[in-house]
Regions:
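Conserved N-terminal alpha-helix of the aminotransferase class I/II PLP-enzyme fold
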Residues: 30, 34-72, 260-262
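Active-site phosphate-binding strand-loop segment of PLP-dependent enzymes
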Residues: 119-174, 178
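PLP-dependent enzyme catalytic core of the Aspartate aminotransferase-like
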Residues: 156, 296-299, 305, 310-337
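N-terminal "arm"/small-domain region of PLP-dependent enzymes with the aminotransferase-like
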Residues: 1-43, 58, 136
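PLP-dependent aminotransferase class I/II
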Residues: 23-25, 193-269, 275
């Protein structure tokens, strides 16, 4: 059965979809406008995305021939599942993890095997490997840092997984890695079976244009099988302009990380909720009184991500938004103590 993916509300203070809270800088935005005004909109886009891939290759320090781009990293993940997982083959992932994996597996009539993590998202890598071997899985895919928990494994642990499953594709979904520490990019040269997927939706604040990347040695053999003209000229142009200013985003990323740590340090000892350490642009938590907490956020017109169990996820916003979140969390804690 295909599991649907729910889109999100678009009004109030939106801290539910892990978007950047601030729009593109005005100077960069003007550069984008100028670049778009020179496009030949009557012509099809460059299906090779040559300039975009060159810029991203420089940032990632990989050959541009190892890069493929599409409409968000979701499309790249879906393409890999479609290509490698024939009907009844098994994808091995974590639980909880990004719901789109279930969606694409369902479309492909494949199977999915989920390894249950601890409440904070951590898991025993050796047991994960052993279980995957026993189940004879056909593909490894999970987000790192994890969505929704924010937990991240180390490069050493990623290497162990890549080595253990070197005969099948191993895909690390690094949508949030700009806010983390250790990437799998450095494993690509050693492990041809490894792919890394990235996005411009989070750290670069370009969720509205849908631009994501797949990186790996085997990209070249997959390129001709990917949908032509996947990225419009407008998307390529906007993404290219922003990537030329990649260094300017480092300060924004550092601020988000600083705010994340500030918020976590304040709430980590709270008794009425449990918040977990994060390597992403959000905090993940649980509370047995979650319904009351959600109601308190709703009163302040703040939308956070609600899950079916006792858990929730809060995107790191602007400093002002974060202070509003902390105010709600403080009042929730003290009112129930």
């Amino acid at each position: 059965m295909v599991q649907g993916y729910k889109t999100h509300v678009q009004s109030g203070i939106l801290l539910n979809a892990n978007e950047a809270s601030q729009n593109v800088d005005e100077a960069i935005k003007q550069e984008i406008i100028d670049a778009i005004s020179n496009l030949s909109l009557n012509r099809y886009p460059d299906t090779t995305c040559q300039e975009l891939h060159r810029l991203y290759a420089d940032i990632m320090n990989v050959p541009s021939s190892w890069i493929l781009s599409g409409n968000g990293s979701d499309q790249m993940l879906g393409f890999l599942i479609q290509y490698y997982l024939r009907e009844n083959k098994t994808l091995y992932t974590l639980s909880p993890d990004f719901s789109m994996y279930d969606y694409y597996v369902g479309l492909n009539h494949s199977k999915i095997e989920k390894y249950e993590t601890n409440l904070d998202g951590s898991f025993d890598v050796d047991v994960f490997i052993s279980n995957g071997k026993d189940k004879k899985v056909d593909m490894i895919l999970f987000s790192n840092p994890n969505n929704p928990t924010g937990h991240a494994i180390t490069k050493c642990e990623m290497k162990k997984i890549s080595e253990a499953f070197k005969d099948i594709p191993v895909i690390f979904d690094e949508a949030y890695m700009e806010f983390g520490k250790e990437s799998a990019i450095g494993l690509l040269k050693e492990y041809p079976n490894v792919f890394v997927c990235r996005t411009l939706s989070k750290a670069y604040g370009l969720a509205g244009i849908r631009c994501g990347f797949m990186l790996g040695q085997q990209v070249e053999k997959l390129r001709d099988l990917f949908i032509p003209y996947a990225l419009s000229s407008v998307t390529q142009t906007i993404a290219s302009v922003v990537l030329k200013h990649a260094d300017a985003y480092k300060e924004n990323i550092a601020t988000i990380i600083s705010e994340r740590e500030r918020m976590y340090q304040e709430v980590k000892e709270f008794k009425q909720l449990t918040m977990y350490p994060s390597n992403a642009n959000f905090l993940f938590g649980r509370s047995e009184k979650k319904d009351l907490l959600l109601e308190m956020f709703k009163e302040k017109n703040i939308t956070i991500r609600n899950y079916e169990d006792a858990s929730f996820r809060i995107t790191i916003g602007t400093k002002e938004e974060n202070e509003m979140v902390l105010d709600v969390l403080r009042r929730f804690e003290y009112a129930n103590s």
